[in-house]
Amino acid sequence: MNVFQMRDKLKDRLNHLDVKFSFNREDETLRISRIDNGKGVTVKINPIVAKYKSQKEKIVDEIVYYVEEAVEQMKGEALENTDNIQIMPVLRSPSFDKKDKNGNSFVIDAHTAETNIYYAVDLGKSYRLIDEAMLEELKLTKQQLKEMALFNVRKLENKYTTDEVKGNIFYFVNSNDGYDASRILNTSFLNEIQAQCEGEMLVAVPHQDVLIIADIRNKTGYDVMAHLTMEFFTKGLVPITSLSLGYDKGHFEPIFILGKNNKQKRDPNVIQRLEATRKQYENKDKK
């Protein structure tokens, strides 16, 4: 599967939409725009081709779903009902776009050196990032927006699964509601987990649909965490960061794991365990 074949596959899958397609050969991107108002999304083809090698049609299905939802929400600019809207925080990498395609600046708060906080209107199956113009339309201040978002993320359920690898405990939040990574902003939840930790607590948001928390009890745990975050980072539709963050009572500190325990890191039993964990989430997504 090459870039041009993937371009054609996506066009075939999206041909039922009332849109036009524009392919940029230099950037290897496909622009899908509504015919009625010209608004749309731009998809980078090359990363999809790379993921297709391991994920096959699953990654194509995800992209098609994302485009369909985005194009549907671009029918009109105005929010029809601002009385019952749900404001949520979403995490993005510092390299993520600061403006939309029309040049409108998104509302952004700094979080860590590896993460920024954006704000979104929840639309059920998707969400729409809030820009400065929409903030005025909502008649909210930035502080009010932030308070509403943090209040709402604290109301989310925090279901998680646990796994033990080489004596280290790993917690996985993967509800697939679009806000798994956002739960890193729930300080009360993180403090509850920290109270259970016997070693150093690390957290990671490799992509928007997972939050990983680790209780690192020995040196091998750092290598396991590094491998784990990289695995999730490369598989995520909206990647955030492959680095872990040290956590202590509301304070985050980005850390870079050098991988000194390379022999232990490459232990086949550890790798097999990590792959099984990742595939568990892939199978969950397919259901």
UniProtKB/Swiss-Prot annotation:
InterPro entries: DUF1444 (IPR010838). It holds the Pfam family DUF1444. It comes from the Bacteria. Belongs to the UPF0354 family. HAMAP family: UPF0354. This is UPF0354 protein SSP1020. It comes from Staphylococcus saprophyticus subsp. saprophyticus (strain ATCC 15305 / DSM 20229 / NCIMB 8711 / NCTC 7292 / S-41). The lineage of its organism: Bacteria, Bacillati, Bacillota, Bacilli, Bacillales.
